[in-house]
Amino acid sequence: MNRIIIIVSFFMLASINIYSQNLTVVDVFEAVSKIDGFQEMDYVEDDIKFPVEIGTPKMIIHGNAEPREQVLRLLKNLPESSLVYDSTDERGKFDRIFINTIIYDLLYVHIGLGGNDTVLILFRGGNRKCIDEFIKDIRGFDY
């Protein structure tokens, strides 16, 4: 009987909800990529204009905004200081950029409304100076 309790306790600990952890931008990207309906897509530079120097992109897309709440719950577990850009319209559609300043991974998140796509692009291995300049340009000031 004690063995069963120990095994059950272990599995309960092992399945602790990812929504309750402190996450990195890579953790968020990987967790979102596992949400039903997300697909990895080729990043096409002509479609979305990000400087090449900010890193190697990996993009996932969901065909609508259905996973909005799940994505928002994950994003809330990033450090507040990681949010470096936020453009939210009056209806709640947004574009946000998060950064891990220790290793300079950058995460772009677009969430539309209703039938609009949900897009996440993770940039890794970018040039720190170029990332700083990019953020300064889009914000209009240093962060």
Question: Which residue stretches match the model-derived regions?
Answer:
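Early exported N-terminus immediately downstream of N-terminal targeting peptides
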Residues: 22-71
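A short, solvent-exposed beta-edge/loop patch
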Residues: 98-129
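Residues that form generic nucleotide/phosphate-binding pockets
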Residues: 31, 73-77, 134-137
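Sec/Tat signal peptide C-region and signal peptidase I cleavage site
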Residues: 16-22
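Surface-exposed amphipathic alpha-helical segments
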Residues: 128-143
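Positively charged n-region of N-terminal signal peptides that target proteins for export
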Residues: 1-4, 21
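Mature extracytoplasmic domains of secretory-pathway proteins
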Residues: 58-108
